[in-house]
């Protein structure tokens, strides 16, 4: 990733162009996906780059304030949305910002590129932030990795599964799902919105003890 601050004060970022294809949803549980995500989260050069861009850490409270301000009246009519917002208010994660890392923010399979040389890349860094890595981990696992494979995924990534991590993953997946629902509602893509409403309901009903 290459960055440069221009005269307006904005920062331009770029990546080398690579020929290849997107990963399929079924490929997202592969070992190399977990390994690359860990490499990104642990990258000091990437973290320092974001700090040079004067990027401030994104805390759960900031995310919650932003999502509450963005929701339309129509989205708020959905019972699962109101239930999810109550959950978010009652379960705000508490992770020391010293443990925040580079977070991509959109680990959808469309953003994983497998090059002609069988090299894996994570592209589209517009939403990159300094935040809790559980933001990426949660969305990836809930969307693409069967629950019975989570333990193996954690081992590959190099983190010990814990109640705290599971709580944070669920919280961030819920709040990002609400954001997707609002976005699709604004775009009037109601089929996609309903898909995310169903997904949100599944996440809310999973791991009911957290």
State the predicted function of each range.
Residues 1-5, 115-120, 210:
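Conserved NTP-binding catalytic cores of kinases and kinase-like/nucleotidyltransferase enzymes
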Residues 89-135:
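Active-site acidic catalytic loop and adjacent metal/ATP-binding pocket
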Residues 6-26, 61-70, 177-190:
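A glycine-centered beta->alpha junction motif in the catalytic cores
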Residues 115-166:
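Active-site Asp-x-Gly
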């Amino acid at each position: 990733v290459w960055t440069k601050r221009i005269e307006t004060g904005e920062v331009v970022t770029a990546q080398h162009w690579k020929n290849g294809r997107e990963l399929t949803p079924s490929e997202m549980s592969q070992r190399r996906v977990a390994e690359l995500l860990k490499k990104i989260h642990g990258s000091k050069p990437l973290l320092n780059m974001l700090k040079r861009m004067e990027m401030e850490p994104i805390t759960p409270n900031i995310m919650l304030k932003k999502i509450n301000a963005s929701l339309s009246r129509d989205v708020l009519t959905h019972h699962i949305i109101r239930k999810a917002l109550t959950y978010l208010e009652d379960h705000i994660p508490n992770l020391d910002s010293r443990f925040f890392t580079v977070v991509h923010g959109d680990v959808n399979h469309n953003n994983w590129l497998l090059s002609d040389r069988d090299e894996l890349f994570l592209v589209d860094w517009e939403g990159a932030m300094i935040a809790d890595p559980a933001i990426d981990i949660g969305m990836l696992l809930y969307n693409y990795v069967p629950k019975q494979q989570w333990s193996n995924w954690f081992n590959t990534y190099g983190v010990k599964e814990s109640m705290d991590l599971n709580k944070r993953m669920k919280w961030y997946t819920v709040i990002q799902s609400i954001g997707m629902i609002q976005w699709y509602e604004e775009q009037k893509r109601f089929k996609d919105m309903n898909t995310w409403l169903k997904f949100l309901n599944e996440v809310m009903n999973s791991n009911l003890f957290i």
